[in-house]
Regions:
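Transmembrane alpha-helix boundary signature
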Residues: 48-65, 77-87, 103-121, 190
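Transmembrane helix-loop junctions at the membrane interface of multipass transporters and ion channels
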Residues: 108-122, 189-194, 221, 228-248
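Membrane-interfacial segments at transmembrane helix termini in multi-pass membrane proteins
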Residues: 252-312
Length: 468
């Protein structure tokens, strides 16, 4: 293929990626954004295959076709069979694929540098820039791979969702980071691949030790950070391969993931480093002063909730992780339809870090065909709680905790929360009075205008619909 035509097609592919990502910012254009991004990827893949040279070689084309069919087949099966409630785990696994791909390409480049045109014929060693590229690619890729596997394991429940900490953890991570820099320098200076293999093994270990101390409450940020890592790893590999489309795509994914991480950290009033250092929510506190709460709560059932909702003129539903665990989104949609027919104004309030991945609640509500126009972000709806008759909270513990605004000793102090306590009545569906991932009790449970509905979220909502 002509070099100029190849460059133009890669540029078109990059533009499609940019427009596609931009379209994902709105639910109304998200589907179009996905299609544009798919088209961009298809163009990039076809151009890359043609650019290999002899595309008539049966072995080469067989390997390419086999890879496309195998990967596409697995992806299709996953997309069709995995429920939307498991999307955080899927995103974590997909991030790990990006990481291991970067590792494999970097390893291949070190093993056969001549095939990648990165071998200096005069010294019979990798070019200086190529040595740095492959080292960075394998470090970021390996950390992304092992870290994403740990994150997915935590989300799936295969690994404890609580922070796993041990004495000397932070000094150990710092020591490994310094060691990685030293190993890279030795590889670049000497060209001895032994240093490269050492830093590869160390990076895999770093991915584990960096993620295990991070608790479930911070998983949305971790997923965004690992997504960013996978993007930057891909961009670095793009330089090694000399692939413009891969550089553009990796840079887009990396930068957008980094920006999303910053936005979510800001939404929790946490710094990036405090999230990555982990340990948040590791000690379960009973209350603001460490004393277990013994105050009585107002308990209710489905009939009580139905009676209150029948008399309401306005309702705001606040979904949380409890909705995802119980897979209650479709039952909630039924409740919404029933109340709307009765003339009740129903809106949804979504906190930026509700759930276990960025946009977790939005994805689940979209699956249940909840209208995009009825879903509001924190800053757009917080002022409306004071004028709302009833708020229905479904397992959204920490993001509705008023102590974030009043208790300076609370771990979540300063985190923007939904002002649900200002509503006329708060119906809170929860299995028990247990604290959330932040490890602090929610004083909202004990307010006079709060009624606790202890049950599985899906069952309780279904019972409320029946009672209506």
């Amino acid at each position: 293929m002509d070099a100029n035509l190849e460059a133009i097609l890669y540029l078109v592919s990059g533009v499609l990626f940019i427009v596609g990502i931009r379209s994902l910012s709105s639910p109304e254009t998200a589907r179009t954004g996905n299609l544009l991004s798919m088209l961009g990827m298809a163009i990039a893949i076809i151009v890359t295959i043609i650019g290999l040279g002899d595309i008539t070689d049966p072995l080469t084309m067989g390997m390419i076709a086999g890879g496309i069919l195998l990967g596409g087949g697995i992806g299709a099966v996953v997309a069709l069979r995995v429920p939307m409630t498991d999307m955080p785990q899927v995103v974590g696994i997909l991030n790990s694929f990006g990481g291991i791909a970067a590792v494999l390409v970097s390893v291949a480049a070190v093993l056969s540098p001549a095939d990648f045109n990165i071998l200096d014929a005069t010294t019979n060693a990798l070019f200086l820039g190529s040595s740095i590229e492959t080292s960075l690619g394998v470090i970021i890729g390996a950390i992304t791979f092992s870290g994403s596997i740990i994150a997915a394991g935590k989300l799936q429940g295969l690994i404890s969702g609580s922070p796993i900490v041990f004495k000397g953890q932070h000094p150990l991570n710092a020591l490994m980071a310094i060691s990685a820099v030293v190993l890279v320098c030795m590889f670049v200076i000497t060209g001895d691949a032994t240093w490269f293999w050492a830093v590869t093994a160390l990076a895999f270990l770093m991915g584990i030790t960096l993620i295990i101390p991070i608790g479930g409450a911070d998983m949305p940020v971790v997923i965004a950070i690992l997504n960013s890592y996978s993007g930057f790893a891909g961009a670095i590999v793009g330089f090694t391969l000399g692939n413009t489309a891969l550089i553009i795509t990796g840079a887009l994914v990396g930068s957008s993931g980094a920006i999303l991480s910053y936005i979510m950290c800001k939404a929790m009033n946490r710094s990036f480093f405090s999230v990555m250092l982990g340990g948040f929510g590791g000690e379960v506190a009973a209350g603001a002063d460490g004393v277990e709460e013994t105050r009585p709560v107002k308990r209710g059932n489905a009939d009580d909730a139905a009676f209150i909702l029948k008399s309401a003129g306005s309702l705001i539903i606040v979904p949380g992780y409890g909705m995802a665990v119980a897979q209650a989104q479709h039952a909630i949609r039924e409740l919404t339809d029933e109340l709307t027919e009765r003339g009740v104004s129903v809106k949804f309030a979504v906190h930026p870090v509700a759930g276990r991945m960025p946009g977790h609640m939005n994805v689940l509500l979209a699956e249940a065909n909840v209208s995009y126009d009825d879903v509001y972000e924190l800053e757009d709806i917080n002022s409306e709680f004071a004028q709302t008759d009833v708020v229905l909270v479904i397992g959204a513990n920490d993001v509705t905790n008023p102590s974030a605004k009043t208790d300076t000793s609370s771990p979540i102090y300063g985190m923007p929360v939904l002002d649900v306590e200002n509503a006329g009545t708060v119906l809170f569906i929860k299995r028990s009075l247990a604290s959330g991932y932040a490890g602090v009790n929610n004083p909202l449970f004990f307010e006079d205008n709060t009624m606790m509905l202890f049950s599985d979220a899906k069952k309780m909502v279904e019972d409320i619909v029946k009672a209506l």
